[in-house]
Swiss-Prot record:
Biological classification of the source: Viruses, Duplodnaviria, Heunggongvirae, Peploviricota, Herviviricetes
Cystine crosslinks: none
Entry coiled-coil feature ranges: none
Region (Disordered): 53-86
Ig-like domain residues: 258-356
Keywords from the named record: Glycoprotein, Host cell membrane, Host membrane, Host-virus interaction, Immunoglobulin domain, Membrane, Secreted, Signal, Transmembrane, Transmembrane helix
PROSITE patterns in the record: IG_LIKE
InterPro entries the UniProt entry points to: GA_GC (IPR001038), Ig-like_dom (IPR007110), Ig-like_dom_sf (IPR036179), Marek_A (IPR001654)
Highest taxon above the source species: Viruses
Record-given protein name: Envelope glycoprotein C homolog
Length: 501
């Protein structure tokens, strides 16, 4: 029984000298400090991983007292002694203790499973290493890895609700459809001399970590969070063969309340359905917003065959959601008050807001275009007072100085509407000319209300009356010419006779 213990002790002695050798990475900067404070705080190192040594955790005592319920804190105080024989004896005793406790499994307990943190603020969580007993040799055989994993957002852009239920969000091709990769934030070790070591960090001072050596607790801060920090942290304990023993997930939920909510209810023509859109701008994450509709205070339900929702992501601003709804016939009732109620929810946090709009209803005007007495005349009935007339000849707008528009009276069927008459001289240019009377001022397409007719001034269109007129004029001219000639001949003959006499 003595021989195995001696061999084991000699093995630990060899390991000890190996750690202290100048060629070893850990021992290169190792200094034995028996007065190490129980609280350590550090930022993960930003040194290069390639061939560079690990960084020793600086001794920075915390100014705040940390109270925990860690079991048997005072029972596991490590006493370091000098001299080779004392070190061998200490490790031999520890080895024996480990052999008696191999059936006990270590554990990691964290104070939360989800960290809800608002944009540009700091998120925190604390994890405690439960090892009984947490001896130096066991600590040196454990590695704590802190790994960030993003939550990707790929989704059906037309149905946010279904995507939210399925846990999938995003519009393929958006700048957040492909987030940052999973990466190791920090790898923490403790050697038999009680010194903690950390691996390089990919983000400098983005992450802040502190350790309570007495209670075996680790705190993590994620500073100035942005959308790319939305994901989950893995706290993994590995053995000396790099095999994972425990894997804890702490979700980092980045939050942003909606910046604004607006309802757009475009104007409609009498007889058409009302339509409205609710725009929820700059919130996070996608799927955290719930939209409901009210019509005059009553619940209105969107129809799946014609209504829906879609959203997009703007870098640095968050997600924007648009929800649409179609309501009843505008020719039956007065314009309703359409309200959009928005609830943003993350964890136990709820924020609500609403917006309202009343659409405007326009009635179809009546137009007629005719030609009379050398004018193109447009008769308009039942238009609002802000509506004006524009004439076009061959689809080219004419200056308003070339035509005249007057109010002829009030509309008898629609309140606050009036009747108009507008006319423009036709071109008597022996060609076929297109005239268009267009109403300006409606919030629809410019050519929504207009009437067009052709004025045909060609000879063929003028017909028999014109031919008769021309013939009569020519005949009269011939008769007059002949009369003049005969009169001249008579005068000539009379004058000649008088001369002979």
């Amino acid at each position: 029984m003595l021989t195995p213990r001696v061999l084991r002790a000699l093995g630990w002695t060899g390991l000890f000298f190996l750690l202290l050798s100048p060629s070893n990475v850990l021992g290169a900067s190792l200094s034995r400090d028996l007065e190490t404070p129980p609280f350590l705080s550090f930022d993960p190192s930003n040194i290069s991983i390639n061939g560079a040594p690990l960084t020793e955790v600086p001794h920075a005592p915390s100014t705040e007292s940390v109270s925990t319920n860690s079991e048997s804190t005072n029972e596991h105080t490590i006493t370091e002694t000098t001299g080779k024989n004392a070190y061998i004896h200490n490790n031999a005793s520890t080895d024996k203790q480990n052999a008696n406790d191999t059936h006990k499994t270590p554990n990691i307990l964290c104070d939360t499973e989800e960290v809800f943190v608002f944009l540009n603020e700091t998120g925190r969580f604390v994890c405690t290493l439960k090892v009984d007993p947490p001896s130096d040799s066991e600590w040196s055989n454990f590695v704590l890895d802190l790994i960030f994993n993003p939550i990707e957002y790929h989704a059906n852009e037309k149905n946010v609700e279904a995507a939210r239920i399925a846990g999938l969000y995003g519009v393929p091709g958006s700048d957040y459809a492909y987030p940052r990769q999973s990466e190791l934030i920090s790898s923490i070790r403790r050697d038999p001399q009680g010194t903690f070591w950390t691996s390089p960090s990919p983000h400098g001072n983005k992450y802040f970590i502190w350790i309570n050596k007495t209670t075996n607790t680790m705190g993590v801060e994620i500073r100035n969070v942005d959308y790319a920090d939305n994901g989950y942290m893995q706290v993994i304990m590995r053995d000396h063969f790099n095999r994972p023993l425990i894997d804890k997930h702490i979700y980092i939920r980045v939050c942003q309340r909606p910046a604004s909510v607006d309802v757009l209810a475009p104007p409609v023509l009498s007889g058409e359905n009302y339509k409205a859109s609710c725009i929820v701008r700059h919130f996070y994450p996608p799927g955290s917003v719930y939209v409901s509709w009210r019509q005059n205070g009553n619940i209105a339900t969107p129809r799946k065959d014609r209504d829906g929702s879609f959203w997009w992501f703007e870098s640095g601003r968050g997600a924007t959601l648009v929800s649409t709804i179609t309501l009843g016939n505008s020719g039956i009732d007065f314009p309703p008050k359409i309200s959009c109620l928005v609830a943003w929810k993350q964890g136990d946090m709820i924020s609500t807001t609403n917006a309202t709009a009343i659409p405007t209803v326009y009635h179809h005007p009546r137009l007629s275009l005719a030609f009379k007495d050398g004018y193109a005349i447009c008769t308009i009935e039942c238009v609002p007072s802000e509506i004006t007339v524009r004439w076009l000849v061959h689809d080219e707008a004419q200056p308003n100085t070339t035509y005249n528009t007057v109010v002829t009276g009030l509309c008898r069927t629609i309140d606050r509407h009036r009747n108009l008459l507008s006319r423009i001289p036709v071109w008597d240019n022996w060609t076929k000319t297109k005239y268009t009377c267009r109403l300006i001022g409606y919030p629809f397409d410019e050519d929504k209300f207009q009437d067009s007719e052709y004025y045909d001034a060609t000879p063929a269109a003028r017909g028999t009356p014109m031919v008769i007129t021309v013939t009569a004029v020519l005949g009269l001219a011939v008769i007059l010419g002949m009369g003049i000639i005969m009169t001249a001949l008579c005068l000539y003959n009379s004058t000649r006779k008088n001369i002979r006499l």
